[in-house]
Amino acid sequence: MIYFFLKKIKMKLVSWNLNGIRAVEKKGLSEILEYINADIIGFQETKAQDDQVKEALKNVAGYHIYSSSAVKKGYSGTAILSKKEPIKVTYGLGIEEHDQEGRLICAEYEHFFYITTYVPNSGSGLHRLEYRSKWDSDLLNFIKNKEKEKPVFLCGDLNVAHKPIDLKNPKSNFNKTPGYTQTEID
C-alpha cells in the first residue's frame, strides 16, 4: 500500500544512518545526495550539533534542512532534508526524558508525516533495556496519535535485528549483541 501511495504522489524517500555526518561529508556527501536526488532524506546518528550539521551540508543545494542534536556533543542526532518545505516540523516525542538525545524529527506534509528516528540501543548487558522499552512504548503512542490525522512513514535506525537476515553472523551474535537478544526481539 505504501508503495502505491508513493507512486501516486511521486516522491522518493530515503533513510540513512550516517554514523557521523562530518566524516561522511569528507567522503563526498553532497555528490552522493545529488546522485540520489531524493525528495526527503532522513539521517540518523549525525553525531554533531545543529550548526555542525548545517556546516556539513553547506554544499547541498535544494533542500530545507532540519536538525536535532543531543545535549551530549558528538552523540546520536537526527536530521531531515526536504525539497519541499513541510507544513510543520517537531523535534522529539515531547517527553523531556527522551528529547535530550536528538533522536527524532517529525515533518508534516499535506498527505503524510515523515519521521526519522535513531532509537536508543539497549546497550551491552542490556543496561538500557528498561529505558529502551519506555522509549518504544512512547514512540508507538506518538505514531498512533499521528496516524489519527494521516499516514506515517517511520524511517530510521530502530536498533533491533528482528530476523537472522538482519545481522551479519546471526548465530554467533544471538543473545550477545545489543538489538539481537531474545528479550528485545520478543
Where in this protein do the model-derived segments appear?
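Soluble or luminal CAZymes and related metallo-dependent hydrolases
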Residues: I21-E25, D99, Y131-L139, Y180-T183
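Metal-dependent phosphoesterases centered on the DNase I-like endonuclease/exonuclease/phosphatase
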Residues: I40, A61-H64, W135-D186
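Short catalytic/ligand-binding loop motif for oxyanion handling, primarily in non-cytosolic enzymes
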Residues: R22, D50-Q52, G74-Y75, G123-L126, ...
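N-terminal, active-site-proximal structural segment of metallo-dependent hydrolase catalytic domains
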Residues: I2-N59, H64, A70, Y75-S76, ...
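Structured beta-strand-rich core segments of catalytic domains in phosphoester-bond hydrolases
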Residues: T46-K47, Q52-S122
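Surface-exposed cleft-lining segments at the edges of enzyme active sites
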Residues: G94-I95, V119-D136, K171-K176
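Short amphipathic alpha-helices and their capping/turn segments at secondary-structure boundaries
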Residues: S30-E34, R103-E110, D138-K150
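Active-site-proximal beta-strand elements of phosphoester/diester hydrolases
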Residues: M11-N19, H111-G123, C155
